[in-house]
From Swiss-Prot:
This is N-acetylmuramic acid 6-phosphate etherase. It holds the Pfam family GKRP_SIS_N. Belongs to the GCKR-like family. MurNAc-6-P etherase subfamily. Residues 55-218 form the SIS domain. The keyword Lipid metabolism does not apply. Coiled coil: none annotated. It comes from the Bacteria.
Length: 298
């Protein structure tokens, strides 16, 4: 398919005269178009759920979440990877974002990088990609050569491959075990896929990574139990999580968090079972870090 024929490259009839619109009219036009995004993502719920299911299994076996993309898509992948570390207390080496052109491309375009098929393979080889890993390829147009190169190589080593595009029958989808294609329609500004397409990709990434973390036992009821309290705001949040999850007072929550070496999951387990820190850690390990299992079995 030619680039000009892609949905993401079409002109949007609803914004043809946006150049002469007032600021309020601009906001209303963009807002009306953005309302279509959630519905487009909703058409892919079964594929997204499948991605969560399969990725959760690989991650539990020691695999890594590896996001690959160019431009906006690459930056969104890096953002998701980076945020998982403090939110769910995971090893930074288990959530990795790759962008065509390397780290400098995060802040400034690197000409020609996204068109380099071999560069994608090289970047994954440098990470020593293996069959336990999960590779998520992002491309709004569904045709970025760098992403195709990544997915092709990932298939060779039998890693799980997931593609996220904003067009139907995407090129990257041909090289993915699971193809997610949320068609959001033409952008308000023609071809500016950082807008609706970028938002759709971010929503899908939120669902996949959050789902995978939930399945690792990183959430109890609907609160984060593996948050990394690295500053005063997060320490306060950690205490509130313990209060909500166990019903104890603020002072008890704070005291137990300190005894648990600032580990929220361990603190909750201590309060739920009445055991000390060492025993709580053993129990959590037995239950694969899942506090619901701890509560039900102890």
């Amino acid at each position: 398919m030619n680039i000009k024929d892609l949905t993401t490259e079409q002109r949007n009839p609803k914004s043809l005269h946006i150049d002469s619109a007032t600021p309020l009219e601009i906001v209303k036009i963009i807002n009306q178009e953005d309302k279509k995004i959630a519905d487009a993502v909703g058409t892919q719920d079964k594929e997204i759920a499948k991605a969560i299911e399969y990725a959760s299994k690989r991650y539990r076996e020691g695999g890594r979440l590896i996001y690959v993309g160019a431009g906006t898509s690459g930056r969104l992948g890096i953002l998701d990877a980076v945020e998982l570390v403090p939110t769910y207390r995971i090893n930074p080496e288990r959530a990795i974002g790759l962008i065509a052109g390397g780290q400098s491309a995060m802040f400034r375009a690197v000409e020609g990088a996204e068109d380099d098929l071999q560069l994608g393979e090289k970047d994954l080889k440098d990470l020593k990609l293996n069959e336990k890993d999960i590779v998520i390829g992002l491309a709004a147009s569904g045709r970025t050569p760098y992403v195709i190169g990544c997915l092709k190589y990932a298939n060779q080593v039998k890693a799980l491959t997931i593609s996220i595009a904003c067009v139907k029958k995407s090129e990257i989808g041909k090289y993915a075990d699971i193809a997610i294609e949320a068609v959001v329609g033409p952008e308000v500004i023609t071809g500016s896929t950082r807008m609706k397409a970028g938002t759709a990709q971010k929503m899908i990434l939120n669902m996949i990574s959050t789902g995978v973390m939930i399945k690792q036992g990183k959430v109890y009821e609907n609160v984060m139990v593996d948050v990394m309290p690295t500053n005063s705001k997060l320490v306060d949040r950690a205490c509130r999580i313990i209060e909500v999850a166990t019903g104890v007072s603020e002072s008890v929550a704070s005291d137990t968090l300190e005894k648990a070496d600032m580990n929220v999951a361990v603190a909750i387990t201590m309060l739920k079972t009445g055991v000390d820190k060492e025993k709580a850690m053993d129990i959590l390990k037995e239950c694969n870090g899942n506090i619901s299992s701890v509560v039900n079995n102890y």
